[in-house]
């Protein structure tokens, strides 16, 4: 629902304090394009393209080819794949493929990154590396991880939400996000950011707080 890949019939999804239940299909498309970047379990990269070409696909809005290439290379460096940037997707390991997907998600420059089982197809070593990388990029993003492997993320998550049979069974703050302003501190102190029981409220405070990393299990 947060990714706008499915609709909802009960409750309300707020985004920056605004209701979304009245959104039309066009509204949802705009919302998704502007606000959401996805990381999938099955990598979802184009196997016959290089790492660089896969990341550049998310930068087609950048008309200047030189700037597009520089931005892509910077993002690839950020996820530690500079040495593999000219390697085709079919030649990458699982961990390298997921790093490519993370770089592509960052290229979209959306405020929210949704990671759907990002370690599901990875071994333990690669899973730990991807979890640490998602923590690193969460410093200026809201990262929501859906996972059946919480052990890889509990070290980094600021909030853990356990969902069973369509209901929230646990909503636990593991560690408080770090506020940037005194106003944020007052909101955190007042507990205004903790309500998740009946609605998913991705509010202004979520974007101001850093780091922001929610694991949903």
Feature locations, PLM:
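Helix-to-loop junction immediately C-terminal to a conserved catalytic motif
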Residues: 3
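Conserved ABC transporter NBD signature motif
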Residues: 11-19
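ABC ATPase NBD coupling module
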Residues: 20-37, 194, 201
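Conserved signature/switch motifs of ABC ATPase nucleotide-binding domains
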Residues: 33, 87, 108, 139
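ABC-type ATPase nucleotide-binding domains, specifically the catalytic core motifs of the NBD
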Residues: 56-69, 78
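ABC ATPase C-loop
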Residues: 81, 85, 105-106
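Conserved ABC ATPase signature
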Residues: 88-92, 96-98
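Catalytic Walker B motif of ABC-type/P-loop ATPase nucleotide-binding domains
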Residues: 113-116
